[in-house]
Amino acid sequence: LSQKFYTIDKVKLTMAGKRIVLTADRSLMTNYRGNFLYGFIACGPYEVLPEWVFDKVFCPPVETDPITGEAKVAQVGLRRVESALLQGYKRDEIMTVNPDYIEKSIGADTKIVGINVMDPLGMAPVTTTMSPEKLSYVAMKFKKLCANIIQLKKKYDFKVVVGGNGAWELAKSDRMKVHGIDTVVVGEADELALDLFHELETGNAPELMHCYVKNIQNIPEITAPTVNSLIEAMRGCGRGCDFCDVNKRSKKDLPVERLQREAKINLDYGFDSVWLHSDEMLLYGCDNRDFQPNYDAITTLWKGLKDLGANFVGTTHMTFSAVAADPKLIKDISEINDMHKSGRWISTNLGIETVAPDMVKKHLGIKAKPFSPDEWGWVVREGAQILNKNHWFPAATIIIGWPDETPDQVQYTIDMMRDFRAFNFRGLVAPLLYQDFSEKNSMHFGNLNEAQFTLFWKCWENNLRVINDIIPIILRNKTYGPPMKIFMYGLIKAGTWAIMRYLRGLCK
């Protein structure tokens, strides 16, 4: 009987709506079946992959309360904002919700809806490369979310604020109007979130805000589980690449003790691993100008998190230069993870961008440190082999179509791809078309010259070879039953064949 009354109370609260509702589009509200690389599927064209395959096979929704729509896990960025708001609002006034259930949480009492975005209009390099002149899944899902919110806004008259890594795409008045947005926040909202939400309620909030955290102590700790057990280990990078927005942030490391507290929230929820988000994890604790990794700081962090009961500790980003600078570090964190004994491979993202020495000097800042720009090609090759030897699966990027790039410079990277094939590199290389933040000099697929298209082809030739080689590893996913394994095998085979056929057609 008590359970019945509890359910009735939840329904009543839901009908009135929460004062503040936080959400993200459906391409972000998923655990990606424990594989972050599935997130790149959202960058692909909506018309190619049936929506039920996207929603059920690759990106099933996060666990959700079916009565209230509350998401049990959410992006770490949403959790940060949620924690910041809890410094001034009551717990029962705020809810982070699954976008598929958003109408359950919005009502007459709702004052603000906050949306976290990654690539809302499909303008990021991965999306423009994978979905040239087509509607991507990530853009379609955001469009669908906004359509629902606009209808609810007409009924309940609340404010809509958007922030996150992709907020810059919406920082124009016409785009805001079309999507029903009142305020866009570009940058880091940790310190200003509470004041901003008060201003939104009183109608005094600006249309556009640019903000960055000045004091690491002002970044609030998460209080609830995050997607795929991801926690934020550090911000910024310090490498200085001229095309990267992350370079605008100063490097900040979060203390081990704090990371342990946040990791424990996810492990207590039921996750069996910890993922560290960083734009350059191997610079954690780095205290020198040579960018030599701090072995003690990194191994202490890995051990401290593994000892909480995690099966392994992964990270979203490394750099080849840090890997090549300390091969023993990679070996030892792999041993901490028991990767050799278990046979487990862990993926991580790394940027190659180009290996042409002149381009490295001009565009990649000090990405090669502690090595020289002239050594960058060797650094990438050496780093790739070190990672593979220690069971790390690189998901690397290169940039094609720099405005000042010559065919001879492209050839350096083509030669690197041939070397990858020669030593049986196990990893993906995503060729991304150059994107200018002002959109003036952005490269379009139809403008690639012969050398650039050859490089594009070599990357996908590598990717399809590797994907076919690792099908058995993909099918080990513990969320797949026997029927799903058979379906996935057929889908991967058909998908790789279709991609190669498409590329061969472009060659002709």
Residue spans of the language-model regions?
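Radical SAM enzyme core and accessory elements
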Residues: 2-52, 63, 67, 93, ...
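N-terminal [4Fe-4S]-dependent radical SAM core
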Residues: 11-12, 16-21, 31-36, 70, ...
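N-terminal pre-triad scaffold of radical SAM enzymes
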Residues: 16-28, 213-247, 256, 260, ...
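Conserved SAM/AdoMet-binding glycine-rich loop
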Residues: 22, 264-393, 400-402
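Glycine-rich beta-alpha loop elements in corrinoid/cobalamin-binding modules
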Residues: 77, 93-221
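Flexible glycine/acidic-rich beta-alpha junction loops that bind and position SAM and/or redox cofactors
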Residues: 113, 121-126, 169-172, 275-289, ...
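Catalytic cores of alpha/beta
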Residues: 171-179, 332, 404-419
